[in-house]
């Protein structure tokens, strides 16, 4: 069982590494767009913000199965800590969960704040069709 989990983890790490250049390029594009804005009044709200920051949308990514050791537990622990901080500050919280493990844990306490759950339990291979849902 550990060998299977290790092989799947290695495959997932390789996929994540292949996506890193794309992520870095997207980060550069957003930084260039936001730095080129001189007038905050005419800029799109996505880039300039509204200044209110009252509503926070948090996307919690966990697995659908439990073969990840402490991965899911650590993600959920960090998420709950962050949610508690937002609640303490009086912020409104909306949650999207990706993966059934996170949804199962968070719906007990934050069920009314979860606006969507995306799960890939029935898919063997992730592809664009499934990623498009996210």
Report residues per predicted region:
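Conserved loop-to-helix interface motifs that mediate assembly, gating, or partner/ligand docking
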Residues: 1-134
